[in-house]
Amino acid sequence: MNGKIIKGIGGFYYIKTDQGLIECKARGKFRHKDIKPMVGDDVTIKMEHGKGVIEEIHERKSELVRPTVANVSLAFVVFAVKNPDINFDLLNKFLILCEYNNIEVIVCLNKIDLVSEEEREEIKKRINVIGYEVLFINAKKGIGIERLEEKIRGNITVFCGPSGAGKSTLINKLSNKEHMETGNVSVKLGRGKHTTRHSELIEVADGYIVDTPGFSTLEIKDLMDKNSLKYCFPEFTQYNDKCKYRGCLHYKEPNCALKEAVESEKINRYRYEFYVRALEEIIEEEKNKW
């Protein structure tokens, strides 16, 4: 019998099948091979003495670490436009994580009533220019929900973003229930409390959504090596093979096509500077390993 893991708690996995939801444990062989079932996994299960057992985990199309979710095909990166202000460094980190895992990204900007139309367009332009679609939403008022449902259809969609951006409120709207506790934003800090207890797939609009377990502490240097980073910036693609030196990191090498594009304002300088900072962190991390 085949199904999909929609929830995992304490070694038990809840599999959605044609025969309903079945609670399962994983075969010991997975533990011996250091393989752990993940929410989002497509699996084959078997009933033994009235209890479900996971026999096979099908090949994963993608795999996230934070949150621990498999087969995600779309990511909504949720940020508030105000309260708190957008942290573009953190936004870049989320974008890189998604790119590294080959997951399509849509940036969702919440609390749109807190800024003017002019400010919204300026933010949208800044994100569009690096290759990402932007949707404006108001999670509390339900503005933009239908657009999100259109995108969710046929996908496993993950929501990521900082605490206080409105992810839990948004998921409550989409799932039509108080699926998770929603932390109030601290007036002093302007940040939400860590409230999400675990990852779980929720069926919405002929697709699935999964929330991150609160806010993730992302470290790019732990995700990839120095040669992989440049491929996580879509706007760099057309320049990666045009440099004088093969394997150019777009860092200190001469005759670099990307650096020339930055100087001629074809590439956003802020994004390039962020790339350099991230690259230097990776290089330093690699030095420390040896």
Curated annotation (Swiss-Prot):
Name the residues that bind Zn(2+).
243, 248, 250, 256
The protein's matches in PROSITE patterns, at most eight in alphabetical order, are given as: ENGC_GTPASE (PS50936), G_CP (PS51721)
Q: Return any one Pfam family short name.
A: RsgA_GTPase
Q: Does the keyword Ribonucleoprotein apply?
A: no
Q: Which UniProt keywords apply?
A: Cytoplasm, GTP-binding, Hydrolase, Metal-binding, Nucleotide-binding, Ribosome biogenesis, RNA-binding, rRNA-binding, Zinc
**Enzyme kind, highest EC tier:** hydrolase
Q: Any one Gene Ontology biological process term? A: ribosomal small subunit biogenesis
The CP-type G domain is annotated at: 61-218
Q: Which residues bind GTP?
A: 110-113, 161-169
Name where it's found. Cytoplasm
Name the cofactor(s): Zn(2+)
Q: Does the keyword Zinc apply?
A: yes
What is stated as this protein's family in its record?
A: Belongs to the TRAFAC class YlqF/YawG GTPase family. RsgA subfamily.
Describe its function.
Answer: One of several proteins that assist in the late maturation steps of the functional core of the 30S ribosomal subunit. Helps release RbfA from mature subunits. May play a role in the assembly of ribosomal proteins into the subunit. Circularly permuted GTPase that catalyzes slow GTP hydrolysis, GTPase activity is stimulated by the 30S ribosomal subunit.
The name under which this protein is listed is Small ribosomal subunit biogenesis GTPase RsgA
